[in-house]
Regions:
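Reductase modules of NAD(P)H-dependent flavoproteins
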Residues: 1-117
């Protein structure tokens, strides 16, 4: 289906059983270096360490995108504040950090704004 839309999909497996042998972030780095013109937007979800690496790559390369967060959301409506994540204004690096509720403002955020800890 992706090919019908002109989108290339690539597969990465840690053990090399299919597609790229290695972490998906090493494949992402390869694509950013070899085909920067194709890197128009990045959508990320997965384990936090992987998302942090992908986020850094996207931000360093100036690739816009979105990041989908999972978190403990006891109330699910933003009252308990258990799911807050720090955010920054990428256009004003000296500006203060603020916190957003994943269950209320997310779970999808601008890839440049969320601080993954």
């Amino acid at each position: 289906k992706f090919r019908d839309l002109g989108v290339s999909a690539r597969l990465a497996t840690d053990d090399g059983s299919r597609g790229h042998h290695g972490f998906v972030t090493s494949l992402l780095e390869e694509i950013i270096q070899q085909e920067p013109e194709r890197c128009t937007c990045l959508y990320v979800c997965g384990p936090t360490p992987m998302m942090r690496v992908a986020q850094n790559m996207a931000n360093n390369a100036g690739i816009p995108g979105q990041i989908s967060l999972e978190g403990i959301m006891p109330c699910g409506i933003g009252v308990c504040m258990a799911c807050v994540v720090p955010c920054v204004n990428p256009d004003e690096p000296e500006a203060a950090t603020w916190y957003e509720r994943v269950c209320y403002a997310g779970p999808v955020f601008d890839i440049r704004e969320v601080v993954l800890i």
